[in-house]
Structure formats: C-alpha cells, structure tokens
C-alpha cells in the first residue's frame, strides 16, 4: 500500500493528474484490472461496463437512485445488513423481506411477492451472505433468475466478500451474464477500508443512466486512491 501511494504521488504523477478531474467512469487502469478479475469469476464485464464508486455502499445507492422511485417495492434478504434496510427506507422504498435459507432466498416468498407487489429490484448477497455465511446454490440461482425474467425486475448482487471467496462460487451475475443483474463490490474486507474504493458492473444499456447518477452526486471519484488501488491489486 505504501509503495502504491508513493508511486501515484510522485512529482511526475502528480503533475499529470492533479490539475484535472478524474475519468467519469473511474480510473481506466483500475477498471481494466477489475474487468480481468470479474472475467475470472465468470462475470463478463468489459472496462466500459464498470463504474467506480466511493465504496460498495455508494454503488448500491447509485443503483437504487437510478432504477427506483419512492414507493417502489424492493426485495431484500433477511437477516441482512441493517444499513441496506435503513438506506432503502430513507429513499422511501417499500421493503419486502425475503428469508435467507442455507441454499439461497426463500423462493416461495419471492414468488408470492412477485405476484402481489411487482417488485422492481432484488438485493442479494449470494456468496458468504452476511450474517449467515451461506452461499447460493446453483438450483436456487437459476430459479431466482427465472423469476426476474418472468416478472421483469433487476437484481443487484452485493459480492463484497468476493476477494476471500472461491472463484467457482455460484454468482447470479455470472449465470445471467450481466443482462438483468448488476454486480457490486469493494475492498473494505481485505484492504484499506478507509480508502472507500468500490465499483459496480452493469448491463451496457444501463451504464449511461448509472453514470449520470454518479456524476450528479460526486462528479467523479478520488483518482489518486483509485490509481493506488489499481497498483495494489494488479
């Protein structure tokens, strides 16, 4: 980490980067590294489909503000991260809790919600779900994707634990190929949580809308920290 910071804050590097804003999508070196990492997980995300964020929480917020409006129904696994419930509630969303089981979300509950409430989004932690530690089974994953296609809702997959999880673990974004799914992750669980470097990977058709939401909130993200992170993980 110290070596990466020294590299991006050298006089030559600072002269090049300090007098301009960062790239709207995020540092291109970091996005190339992340693209290769996602490809290894089976998630087909080109650098142009990746948007860097101020941590994974910011990525989740961008998705919500882009795809939802106040009053929309959102399915969220329960138990789950209290901040996610609070964040969606603050945005005026109607939260539909889905019990999390050992092999994935309760599919009967999801199907019932789909029939009664027409949810717009499902928020899921497929791998090392917090707090249960469970991982999604292939069978449950395929059924979740079938429900999403049949009832026209998007899925945001929070893969915050990806860097300590097996690459072969079942991920909705890999099975779906980033068609109806959006991938979210960050580095707080393995490296420099106070750098607040996160990212999302989305279907090409959604990238411009998601980027607009990012730009309206933060304009860009901290370029020096993104460059340092790229050197750390490359």
Q: Where are the language model's segments positioned?
A:
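Glycine-rich phosphate-binding segment of PLP-dependent enzymes
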Residues: 1-20
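A generic short alpha-helical patch detector that favors 3-5-residue windows
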Residues: 26, 114, 176, 202, ...
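Conserved core of the PLP fold type I
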Residues: 16-152, 163-175, 182
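PLP-dependent aminotransferase class I/II
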Residues: 182-183, 189-234
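Amphipathic, well-packed alpha-helical segments that form the structural scaffold of globular domains
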Residues: 6, 10, 35-39, 123, ...
């Amino acid at each position: 980490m110290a070596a990466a910071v020294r590299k991006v804050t050298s006089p030559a590097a600072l002269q090049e980067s300090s007098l301009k804003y960062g790239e709207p999508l995020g540092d291109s070196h970091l996005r190339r590294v992340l693209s290769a990492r996602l490809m290894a997980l089976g998630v087909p995300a080109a650098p142009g489909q990746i948007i860097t964020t101020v941590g994974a929480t910011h990525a989740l917020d961008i998705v919500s503000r882009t795809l939802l409006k106040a009053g929309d129904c959102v399915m969220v696994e329960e138990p789950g991260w209290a901040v996610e419930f609070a964040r969606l509630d603050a945005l005026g969303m109607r939260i539909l809790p889905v019990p999390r089981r050992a092999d994935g979300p309760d599919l009967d509950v999801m199907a019932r919600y789909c029939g009664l409430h027409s949810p717009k989004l499902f928020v899921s932690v497929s791998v090392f779900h917090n707090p249960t530690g469970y991982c999604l089974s292939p069978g449950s994953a395929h059924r979740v994707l079938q429900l999403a296609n049949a009832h026209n809702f998007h899925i945001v997959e929070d893969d915050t634990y990806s860097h300590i999880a097996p690459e072969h673990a079942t991920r909705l974004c890999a099975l779906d190929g980033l068609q109806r799914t959006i991938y979210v992750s960050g580095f707080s669980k393995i490296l420099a949580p106070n750098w607040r470097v996160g990212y999302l990977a989305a279907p090409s058709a959604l990238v411009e809308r998601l980027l607009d939401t990012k730009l309206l909130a933060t304009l860009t993200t901290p370029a020096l920290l993104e460059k340092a992170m790229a050197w750390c993980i490359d």
